[in-house]
Amino acid sequence: MRHELSPLLRLLASGEDLIYAPASPEGIPARLLNAEGDDLPSGCDLPAELSVVLWGLDDHIVRELRECPLFDSTTLLFPPITPSYLRLSHRRASYDLLAYLTDQLGYPSDLLPRWIEAGVDRSATELRLRAAIEGIKSRPLGDPTRVLIKRPYSSSGRGVFPLPLPLQEKHLEALVGSCTRSGSVSIEPYLEVVDNWALEYTRSESGEVSFFALSHFDTLPSGRAYLGNILTSPEDLWERLTSLMSEEALLTLINAQCTWLEKELSDSQYTGYIGIDLFFYRDGECLRLHPCVEINLRTTMGVLAHFAYEQYVPDGRKGIFRLERGPRQQPSQSIIPLLLTSSEAHFSAYIELEK
């Protein structure tokens, strides 16, 4: 996946930036691309030092880059992975922000998940999980026939799965195993999601967190995995979101999230993008906002979609940014491919313009 999708990073690149395309599972070696997404000429000399800007900080990726022969004669300068970065990369951080928003802005406390740490043995873990599931089930909010389970470090819909109720022994056994392996799991109400959004921020070297853009995206119902982003002007996105909540409430939420992020990252050297996922859910006859589903301390698909709109969507047009399994879509009046891949490709990325 990373090998095929790496040329998409040209949406973020400019000037003399280089893009690292990792080796493919089929054995195609790693290579470097220029800011336009084209292969660098063979034998091209690299600078003595390169500052590395990662999609997201990850020990595995850092190790891969350090060991890559492409950089044998180049010193790579990596951003530090600090305790505060690791803390905010854990899904527990979204609980902490949600608790803050519940306290400061009055969002319902029934939205708060239950974080269950693995016990000293399987029996202790099972008791904790049973009690937490019963506690979530007793809340007036959510689907009474299931709860939602999340693993601590997964994102973009991965590691998220519904647990059917009443609880069956085989499902409980699998959940105990998952909690034991990952160290903890989150259990929360299963809500009827109507509309998915994200607030995208940037953090500067001075530590200031600023609003960057809105992201309006679709997910697959099964597992709630990412499906695509709505591409339209920032003004239109703002108008769409403030048709679902008041502008005052949105500005208050943005200010509160910025305040919390600046405080939590005060000892961090992280600079770059931060995405906070939201969604609107149905509660009886009402549509309500979940103000913090997930924190993504990295570049997000929403940021990529923002630049795809700026660079590829004609003035006055709207569309959808798609990332899918399978070969690329053929160009047409309504399809703009973003990857020039073969018919054997495993993934495709394209813009589908409104007709």
Predicted regions located by residue number:
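A short alpha/beta connector and helix-capping loop motif
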Residues: 168, 304-317
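Glycine-rich phosphate-binding loop of ATP-grasp-fold ATP-dependent ligases
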Residues: 115, 146-172, 198, 221-241
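Peripheral (often C-terminal) accessory segments that flank ATP-dependent C-N-forming ligase machineries
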Residues: 314-355
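Conserved N-proximal alpha/beta basic substrate-recognition cap immediately N-terminal to
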Residues: 2-8, 20-140, 154-155
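Phosphate-binding site of ATP-dependent enzymes
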Residues: 171-226, 279-292
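Glycine-rich phosphate/pyrophosphate-binding beta-alpha loops
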Residues: 220-222, 292-306
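A long amphipathic alpha-helix within ATP-dependent nucleotide-binding catalytic cores
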Residues: 182, 211-214, 223-288, 324-327, ...
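ATP-grasp fold ATP-binding core
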Residues: 115, 139-162, 183-193, 276, ...
